[in-house]
Amino acid sequence: MKVTFLGHAGFLIEGSKKIVIDPFLTGNPLAKAKAEEVKADLVLVSHGHGDHLGDAVAIAGQSNALVVSVYELADYCARHGAQSHGMHIGGSRAFDGVKIKLTPAWHGAGFGTGEGPMEYLGNPCGFVIKIDGKTIYHSGDTGLFGDMELIGRFNSLDLALLPIGDNFTMGPEDALEAVKMLKPKTVIPMHYNTWPLIEQDPAEFKSAVEAATSAEVKILSPGESMEL
């Protein structure tokens, strides 16, 4: 299975199905891929902020893909022309062999264009994704929370995708504590260095995690892939 970092919190998972998560490409200063180049079967969106909703509707439309998110955000995507399936935190569903479960995330979720008030698009979430015998956790934008221990207890995680940027999400120190609770085999840091406000050194995070846990940290540049 191939996992490609699209930049910021965006990933493309390619196995028996293609899954795109939080595809913020247009307007992303570090993204290498263009939205029109990305094809998917499922598009997962963790919350309604523009740097996560991003190009989800466009990618879903050009691929005839299904957007999966919390109900309010799925409804928003449907109103903008995308096929969508709404869920809520704690719920799970299988989509043609891919099982998705929504997990909590501590963050906000409004969408705005800069004109007028933001539109509420439901609670933010993370995802536990089971595909081709592998289990992947994408936390979405979140702070550290104790129930990460339950996610790690109930799932043997092959890969965890965790933010380290601080300010809007947990920083490297809290992300290390998340790894201790989640107990994944591999971690890819995300949501850092897109802008100066979330600048971090992923090599320092890698050193701290690998010194304190059995997890391996893979640092991917936007456009770079790894085999899982």
Curated annotation (Swiss-Prot):
SUPFAM superfamilies: Metallo-hydrolase/oxidoreductase. It comes from the Bacteria. Keywords: Hydrolase. GO terms for molecular function: hydrolase activity. Belongs to the UPF0173 family. HAMAP family: UPF0173 (MF_00457). PANTHER family: UPF0173 METAL-DEPENDENT HYDROLASE MJ1163 (PTHR43546:SF3), UPF0173 METAL-DEPENDENT HYDROLASE MJ1163-RELATED (PTHR43546). This is UPF0173 metal-dependent hydrolase PTH_1415. It comes from Pelotomaculum thermopropionicum (strain DSM 13744 / JCM 10971 / SI).
